[in-house]
Amino acid sequence: MLISDRDIRTQIDSGRIVLDPFEPSMVQPSSVDVRIDKLFRLFDNHKYAHIDPAEEQPELTRLVEVAADEPFILHPGEFVLGSTYEAVTLPDDVAARLEGKSSLGRLGLLTHSTAGFIDPGFSGHVTLELSNMATLPIKLWPGSKIGQLCFFQLSSPAEHPYGSGAYGNRYQGQRGPTASRSHQNFHRTEI
């Protein structure tokens, strides 16, 4: 069940859901707006002949930091990783979903490719998968609204919440945009 604004505030006030820093004005009818940080992870496309999710490719991306009062310029067709300014911590019976802001989507900005779901038990900054689908560069201002988190009450607490180790916790406690760690649990069925 999607959690309403009043229940979001109750969960935050009780410390069950933690957003750090939390700004009460960011609460919407059924979500909380989140802001973009000043750290970005750019792809160095010339370091590898291809991307292989089964292999560790430590030089595939590099971290850059823009000044707090300067925008990051996302060029048409470009894909970079960013992160939320807020760190998010969820209890074992609440999941979340990152959604983009409609106003930014109408400008051609996508905030995530596929990883919009946040498991119960997660704690850390949410990595954004940013794409510019427009024909002009887009300025991304640190501290500006970039998306919104919707929260879902589970029917019961997760038996093995994220971070417990049962299903893996490769991104638990992440700070800033975190590169893919797909090689750590790559699975391929022989067919």
Swiss-Prot record:
<feature type="binding site">
    <location>
        <position position="162"/>
    </location>
    <ligand>
        <name>dCTP</name>
    </ligand>
</feature>
<comment type="similarity">
    <text>Belongs to the dCTP deaminase family.</text>
</comment>
<comment type="function">
    <text>Bifunctional enzyme that catalyzes both the deamination of dCTP to dUTP and the hydrolysis of dUTP to dUMP without releasing the toxic dUTP intermediate.</text>
</comment>
<dbReference type="InterPro" id="IPR011962">
    <property type="entry name" value="dCTP_deaminase"/>
</dbReference>
<feature type="active site" description="Proton donor/acceptor">
    <location>
        <position position="129"/>
    </location>
</feature>
<protein>
    <recommendedName>
        <fullName>dCTP deaminase, dUMP-forming</fullName>
        <ecNumber>3.5.4.30</ecNumber>
    </recommendedName>
</protein>
<feature type="binding site">
    <location>
        <position position="148"/>
    </location>
    <ligand>
        <name>dCTP</name>
    </ligand>
</feature>
<keyword id="KW-0546">Nucleotide metabolism</keyword>
<feature type="binding site">
    <location>
        <begin position="127"/>
        <end position="129"/>
    </location>
    <ligand>
        <name>dCTP</name>
    </ligand>
</feature>
<dbReference type="GO" id="GO:0033973">
    <property type="term" value="F:dCTP deaminase (dUMP-forming) activity"/>
</dbReference>
<feature type="region of interest" description="Disordered">
    <location>
        <begin position="165"/>
        <end position="191"/>
    </location>
</feature>
<feature type="compositionally biased region" description="Polar residues">
    <location>
        <begin position="171"/>
        <end position="183"/>
    </location>
</feature>
<dbReference type="GO" id="GO:0008829">
    <property type="term" value="F:dCTP deaminase activity"/>
</dbReference>
<dbReference type="GO" id="GO:0015949">
    <property type="term" value="P:nucleobase-containing small molecule interconversion"/>
</dbReference>
<dbReference type="InterPro" id="IPR036157">
    <property type="entry name" value="dUTPase-like_sf"/>
</dbReference>
<keyword id="KW-0378">Hydrolase</keyword>
<feature type="site" description="Important for bifunctional activity">
    <location>
        <begin position="116"/>
        <end position="117"/>
    </location>
</feature>
<dbReference type="GO" id="GO:0000166">
    <property type="term" value="F:nucleotide binding"/>
</dbReference>
<comment type="subunit">
    <text>Homotrimer.</text>
</comment>
<feature type="binding site">
    <location>
        <begin position="101"/>
        <end position="106"/>
    </location>
    <ligand>
        <name>dCTP</name>
    </ligand>
</feature>
<feature type="binding site">
    <location>
        <position position="174"/>
    </location>
    <ligand>
        <name>dCTP</name>
    </ligand>
</feature>
<dbReference type="GO" id="GO:0006226">
    <property type="term" value="P:dUMP biosynthetic process"/>
</dbReference>
<keyword id="KW-0547">Nucleotide-binding</keyword>
<dbReference type="Pfam" id="PF22769">
    <property type="entry name" value="DCD"/>
</dbReference>
<dbReference type="GO" id="GO:0006229">
    <property type="term" value="P:dUTP biosynthetic process"/>
</dbReference>
<dbReference type="InterPro" id="IPR033704">
    <property type="entry name" value="dUTPase_trimeric"/>
</dbReference>
<feature type="binding site">
    <location>
        <position position="119"/>
    </location>
    <ligand>
        <name>dCTP</name>
    </ligand>
</feature>
<comment type="pathway">
    <text>Pyrimidine metabolism; dUMP biosynthesis; dUMP from dCTP: step 1/1.</text>
</comment>
